[in-house]
């Protein structure tokens, strides 16, 4: 399939620059997975589409204040570093701006030496592997020195960094938020539990793939970057029980979806496991894990439009997006949501 088949027209004015005052007041487009029927609701109405015995799966990753501004030690030149993925111990995959002059052996200083980053490997497209040197706990240093890494299409400064975290964010390690989860409030989650709907958590740390567009014409030639994921025994047991009893698994976000489908593909059931996934879901993929999907509206020609198209159909998704544009839904990270069920 050609990447152009996943394009759609989006006025720039519909790209949400700030979150709404109340998380669950976002609009919700409900799409019939098979029928293509469309309903227009508000996000808090999502509970009416969930049934007793269903399990809602949330990604509990936490976004790190991973954008750092510092100096190249040798020259004093200014440099920006976006930490993306922990490779092992204190070695991180990062994006640098400008990257061209940062070579293996060069050191960057942040916060007058509170964090020193040494380049140990050069990657393509501005990527580097950096070894970090610091005292104490890294997260404390990042909270002191770093900024929240908002997506490039958000031009306005975020007044409250917590609005780019889900209310249940726990496991620090992401370079971007799992944005479908931003719509949930603690109160809505309590109401969902009270209805007899299970809530389960997985972790997938959102990394480099989120920032990279598809650069090939034929989507079969696209290579996904790997992201770290983890599922606990408690979550695995709950999901297997949900399937066994004939209830539905509703995935919140494409990150949860990729984790669940990776595990079902590799093990034929849900198991306690951690690892790296580069799963690429596009039309022709057979879903084995999820029965419903809550997600935001994604960038034209992105792998995420392909993922949701594989769950419903390309025609249904592009028709729903066209309707959302017509009715001036808010798009992307701080935008409105879609339930495909």
Curated annotation (Swiss-Prot):
InterPro entries: QueA, QueA_dom1, QueA_dom2, QueA_sf. Disulfide bonds: none annotated. It comes from the Bacteria. One of its GO terms (molecular function) is S-adenosylmethionine:tRNA ribosyltransferase-isomerase activity. One of its GO terms (biological process) is queuosine biosynthetic process. It catalyses: 7-aminomethyl-7-carbaguanosine(34) in tRNA + S-adenosyl-L-methionine = epoxyqueuosine(34) in tRNA + adenine + L-methionine + 2 H(+). One of its GO terms (cellular component) is cytoplasm. Pathway: tRNA modification; tRNA-queuosine biosynthesis. It is found in: Cytoplasm. Its EC number is 2.4.99.17. The keyword Cell inner membrane does not apply. Transfers and isomerizes the ribose moiety from AdoMet to the 7-aminomethyl group of 7-deazaguanine (preQ1-tRNA) to give epoxyqueuosine (oQ-tRNA). Monomer. This is S-adenosylmethionine:tRNA ribosyltransferase-isomerase. It comes from Staphylococcus haemolyticus (strain JCSC1435).
């Amino acid at each position: 399939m050609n990447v152009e088949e996943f394009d759609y027209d989006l006025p720039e004015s519909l790209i949400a620059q700030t979150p709404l005052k109340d998380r669950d007041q976002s609009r919700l487009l409900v799409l019939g997975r098979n029928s293509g029927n469309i309903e227009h609701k508000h996000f808090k109405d999502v509970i009416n589409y969930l049934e007793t015995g269903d399990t809602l799966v949330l990604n509990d990753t936490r976004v790190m204040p991973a954008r750092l501004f510092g100096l190249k030690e040798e020259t004093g030149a200014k440099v920006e570093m976006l930490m993306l993925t922990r490779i092992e111990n204190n070695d991180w995959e990062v994006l640098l701006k400008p990257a061209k002059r940062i070579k293996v052996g060069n050191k960057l200083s942040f916060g007058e030496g509170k964090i020193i980053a040494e380049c140990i490997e050069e990657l393509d497209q501005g990527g580097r592997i950096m070894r970090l040197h610091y005292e104490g706990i890294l997260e404390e240093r990042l909270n002191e020195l770093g900024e929240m890494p908002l997506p490039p299409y958000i031009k306005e400064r975020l007044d409250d960094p917590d609005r780019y975290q889900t209310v249940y964010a726990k496991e620090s390690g992401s370079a971007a938020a799992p944005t479908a989860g931003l719509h949930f409030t603690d109160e809505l989650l309590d109401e969902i539990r009270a209805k007899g709907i299970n809530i389960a958590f997985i972790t997938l740390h959102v990394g480099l793939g989120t920032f990279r567009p598809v650069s090939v014409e034929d989507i079969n030639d696209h290579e996904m970057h790997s992201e770290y994921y983890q599922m606990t025994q408690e979550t695995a047991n709950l999901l297997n029980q949900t399937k066994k009893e004939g209830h539905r698994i509703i995935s919140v976000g494409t990150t949860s979806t990729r984790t669940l489908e990776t595990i079902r593909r590799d093990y034929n059931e849900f198991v306690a496991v951690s690892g790296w996934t580069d799963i690429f879901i596009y039309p022709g993929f057979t879903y084995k894990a999820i029965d419903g999907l809550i997600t935001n509206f994604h960038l034209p020609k992105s792998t995420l439009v392909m993922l949701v198209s594989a769950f419903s159909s390309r025609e249904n998704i592009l028709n729903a997006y066209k309707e959302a544009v017509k009715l001036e839904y808010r798009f992307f990270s701080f935008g409105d949501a879609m339930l495909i069920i």
